């Protein structure tokens, strides 16, 4: 079936023109891509407008693109920026749609099986469906994705085959439309009209497409003919006018044509027979009973409904792939000439490499103990070498590219060191460790008096806590950025720092996202001469760069000797400073401070909720696990639920599934007790 592709050009909206190193970087990147170069690196310092450069390259080449970010927060920032640059084009967001995800797991030592438990974010699910739809329908598409893009997704061929094409004047009876909608996993709901549902009133069928958030389609039939197709707002009912044709996309990426499902069922039955034989031979009768019961239940569900819970575990059969072949992913939905941009590549590339192994070990346990068939091992993220094979022409973007990017790019490393604002990299000073705490106290006071902010990085949690208490006792408004804080709270703390709610932020790893804050004029690195991951050349350059958005930016490294990493970081920072000063001198540029507005919290994946912004916060932003008494008031109940949920998410994240499950059960009990007590 031919699929209609919309070929609208990219139209870049910006009040700025490329300046500094940007014009040259745009030119070289675009030229290399046109010449077919597979790998190149944009070495762009903090605040040099790397995103703007990439946006210009995409607009210049007029090719679809995928931007990979290392986490949801950075992906959300990139998405917001790209949406502002390309308001007339399809800018999409593709990250994991789980707010909370505990995969099914088995712990042999305690004979504990933990069912899969997940909370799916409806808004992000809609955005994922919208992203694949745009890749299939439009050339002017930019998808901003997290590493979720390398995880298995439904097969694009099956997905395309299942689409329902509607056209004014087409002959089709109402029953046929309803059957097709059920096959697409839409449910009928005449009361609550929401995403992925349809309602029927006489000869009118209203469908709320799964990938849409503000448009629904109305089919008006006359006998067995589609008399009119129109779009309307599902909330207000306001009409947007008639359309000649409309395509309804499936509600999930895992829909499969009926004949393919029947074919898959036969293969699953055959594998089940082999597995049963194996378990009986090994005298593992419990495992044999377990796999038989679970698989037969799934087969029955697939036969009756066309899907089952955990259908992705049978994706090898549903997509018709052979054992060990890579699963279909977002890369299979991309046009063949798309670009791949890997942001913060020094973090993202190693992340891609690490996803496969963790997933594999958990699934092998499930297979060994009869919870899953061996074919479930093919529902997995891509291996690194598979990712390399599938990746189109790639631009790596980082202020400190890793060894992989440097090796792949060879000589094609494009420097973007000069900032359009003329801002220089921070000055670096080295001071002795013996005076670090008192010296920091006096520096923090000076900055607070000038309404500027300070970031402090320590090596240990204990040191960070003690330093926070010490500064607090001496009248400094300080907060400690805990590693246990969830992303939303983290964004709020950073927002409060920018608004001047406090002046000093202490943390261990300040390389994480969202810390490019124009108000920060001082970065203090304690114990800078202790070699290790947090004091490596790359980490030091990144941390020093946190003060690069301020006119008076300065970095103080407290050290008694200059390590190899320090020397390299200082040399690189000074190289950049010299290049920036020379450019400013030649072009008569006076450095300008950044006046970046403090925006509202980005509500992607938060359901637009800023509810915790006004709550009083303790000095420490996360608390250790404690035992809980039965709450007496509604407020106490809410606080306790929140604490327990935070712990549960943390345990699930650390793969401590037993502990997460125990807290989940505690939550259920707590809710029941509260309801009983009225």
From Swiss-Prot:
Keywords assigned: ATP-binding, Cytoplasm, DNA damage, DNA excision, DNA repair, Excision nuclease, Nucleotide-binding, SOS response
Lineage: Bacteria, Pseudomonadati, Pseudomonadota, Gammaproteobacteria, Pasteurellales
One Pfam family hit: UvrB_inter
Protein name: UvrABC system protein B
Domains as described in the record: The beta-hairpin motif is involved in DNA binding.
Motif (Beta-hairpin): 97-120
Compartments it resides in: Cytoplasm
Name of the gene: uvrB
Coiled-coil region: none
């Amino acid at each position: 079936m031919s699929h209609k592709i919309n070929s609208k050009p990219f139209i870049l909206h910006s009040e700025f023109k490329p300046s500094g190193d940007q014009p040259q970087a745009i030119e070289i990147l675009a030229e290399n891509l046109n010449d077919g170069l597979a790998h190149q690196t944009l070495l762009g310092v903090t605040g040099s407008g790397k995103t703007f450069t990439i946006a210009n390259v995409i607009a210049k080449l007029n090719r679809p693109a995928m931007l990979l970010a290392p986490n949801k927060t950075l992906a959300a920032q990139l998405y917001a920026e790209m949406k502002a640059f390309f308001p007339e084009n399809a800018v999409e967001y593709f990250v994991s749609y789980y707010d909370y995800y505990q995969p099914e797991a088995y712990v042999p030592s305690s004979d504990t099986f933990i069912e899969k438990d997940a909370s799916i974010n409806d808004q992000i699910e809609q955005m994922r469906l919208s992203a694949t739809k745009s890749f299939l329908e439009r050339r002017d598409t930019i998808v901003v994705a997290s590493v979720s893009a390398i995880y298995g997704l439904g097969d694009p061929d099956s997905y395309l085959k299942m689409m329902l094409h509607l056209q004014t004047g087409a002959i089709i009876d109402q029953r046929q439309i309803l059957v097709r909608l059920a096959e697409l996993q839409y449910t009928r709901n005449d009361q609550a009209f929401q995403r992925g549902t349809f309602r029927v009133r006489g000869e009118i069928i209203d469908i709320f497409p799964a990938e849409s958030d503000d448009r629904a389609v109305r089919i008006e039939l006359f006998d067995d003919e589609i008399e009119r197709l129109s779009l309307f707002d599902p909330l207000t009912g306001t009409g947007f006018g008639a359309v000649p044709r409309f395509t309804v996309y499936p509600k999930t990426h895992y829909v499969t044509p009926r004949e393919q499902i029947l074919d898959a069922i036969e293969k699953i039955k055959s594998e089940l027979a082999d597995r049963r034989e194996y378990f009986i031979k090994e005298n593992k009768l419990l495992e044999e009973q377990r796999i038989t019961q679970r698989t037969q239940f799934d087969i029955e569900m697939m036969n009756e409904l066309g899907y089952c819970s955990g259908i992705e575990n049978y994706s090898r059969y549903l997509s018709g792939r052979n054992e060990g072949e890579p699963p279909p992913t977002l890369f299979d939905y991309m046009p063949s000439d798309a670009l791949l941009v890997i942001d913060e590549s020094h973090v993202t590339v190693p992340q891609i490499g690490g996803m496969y192994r963790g997933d594999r070990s958990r699934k092998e346990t499930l297979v060994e103990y009869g919870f899953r068939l061996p074919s479930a091992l093919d529902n997995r993220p891509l291996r690194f070498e598979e990712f390399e094979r599938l990746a189109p022409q790639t631009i790596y973007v980082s202020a400190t590219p890793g060894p992989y990017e440097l090796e792949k790019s060879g000589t094609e490393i494009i420097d973007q060191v000069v900032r359009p604002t003329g801002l220089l990299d921070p000055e670096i000073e080295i001071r002795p460790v013996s005076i670090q705490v008192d010296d920091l106290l006096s520096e923090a006071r000076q900055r607070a008096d000038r309404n500027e902010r300070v970031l402090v990085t320590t090596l240990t949690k204990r040191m960070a806590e003690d330093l926070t208490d010490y500064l607090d006792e001496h009248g400094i408004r300080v907060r400690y950025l805990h590693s246990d804080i969830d992303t939303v709270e983290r964004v709020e703390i950073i927002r409060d720092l920018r608004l001047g709610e406090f002046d000093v932020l202490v943390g261990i790893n300040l390389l994480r996202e969202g810390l490019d804050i124009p108000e920060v004029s001082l970065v203090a690195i304690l114990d800078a001469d202790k070699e290790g991951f947090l004091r490596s050349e790359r980490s030091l350059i990144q941390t020093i760069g946190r003060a690069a958005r301020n006119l008076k930016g300065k970095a103080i490294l407290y050290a008694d000797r200059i390590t190899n990493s320090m020397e390299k970081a200082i040399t690189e920072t000074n190289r950049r400073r010299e290049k920036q000063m020379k450019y400013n001198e030649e072009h008569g540029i006076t450095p300008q401070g950044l006046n970046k507005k403090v925006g509202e919290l980005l509500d992607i994946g938060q359901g637009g909720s800023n509810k915790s912004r006004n709550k009083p916060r303790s000095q420490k932003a996360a608390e250790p696990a404690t035992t809980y008494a039965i709450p007496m008031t509604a407020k106490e109940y809410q606080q306790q639920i929140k604490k327990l949920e935070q712990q549960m998410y943390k345990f699930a994240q650390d793969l401590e599934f037993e502990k997460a499950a125990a807290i989940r059960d505690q939550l259920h009990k707590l809710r029941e007790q509260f309801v009983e007590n009225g």
